[in-house]
């Protein structure tokens, strides 16, 4: 017996390894087809400033973009933004930018806003945004440099310069929120939607 009842696998409009792992572990078959969109350009042109609103827009835009090329398929888009107070962060461009982000986040609490959207034939069928609050411990300059030495280029693949599912866990004193939200894919609301569409056996 299979858990997934859909006629075709879900399409995941993302190349995120963490999101792919979350879906795979939940028994959801998918085809990973990243969306080739200008995320920063779309966010800036939107005029939106709230991190959750930006994440929601980008998740929807990613899913809609891929949906245009795969008619009839259920396409899942996801995005995550990081906010320190009223200030939003982007993925660091290089090691120096990653170190700067870590200096700013160290010893403070920030928020991760994770959004999902499900689109079919250009129509958004489901959208959700979840928030996790992360408390990074105080870090010395030597600790920041040692961390960046160990993680290498991975520091530039995630906003905040860390992956909590990996070595990034060493940076934190406290984590408040859903584990899947932290990984960038609010899974429980998504599963609820899929069940409502009779796509899951459980």
UniProtKB/Swiss-Prot annotation:
EC number: 3.6.1.9
InterPro entries assigned to the protein according to its UniProt record, in alphabetical order: ITPase-like_fam, Maf-like
One biological process term in Gene Ontology: nucleotide metabolic process
Ranges annotated as spanning the membrane: none
Gene3D superfamilies from the UniProt entry: 3.90.950.10
Top-level taxon of the source organism: Bacteria
Protein name (database record): Nucleoside triphosphate pyrophosphatase
């Amino acid at each position: 017996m299979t858990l997934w009842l859909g006629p075709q696998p879900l399409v995941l409009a993302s190349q995120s390894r963490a999101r792919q792992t979350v879906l795979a572990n939940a028994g959801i078959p998918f085809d990973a087809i990243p969306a080739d969109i200008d995320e920063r350009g779309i966010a800036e042109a939107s005029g939106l400033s709230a991190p959750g609103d930006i994440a929601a827009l980008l998740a929807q835009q990613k899913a809609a973009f891929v949906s245009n090329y795969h008619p009839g398929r259920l396409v899942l888009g996801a995005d995550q933004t990081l906010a320190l107070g009223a200030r939003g962060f982007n993925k660091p461009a290089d090691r120096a930018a990653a170190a700067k982000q870590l200096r700013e986040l160290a010893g403070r609490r920030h928020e991760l806003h994770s959004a999902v959207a499900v689109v079919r034939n250009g129509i958004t069928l489901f959208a959700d945004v979840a928030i996790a609050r992360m408390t990074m411990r105080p870090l010395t300059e030597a600790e920041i440099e040692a961390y960046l030495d160990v993680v290498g280029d991975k520091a530039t693949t995630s906003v905040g310069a860390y992956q909590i599912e990996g070595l990034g866990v060493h940076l934190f004193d406290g984590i408040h929120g859903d584990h899947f939200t932290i990984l960038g894919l609010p899974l429980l609301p998504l599963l609820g939607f899929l069940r409502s569409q009779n796509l899951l056996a459980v």
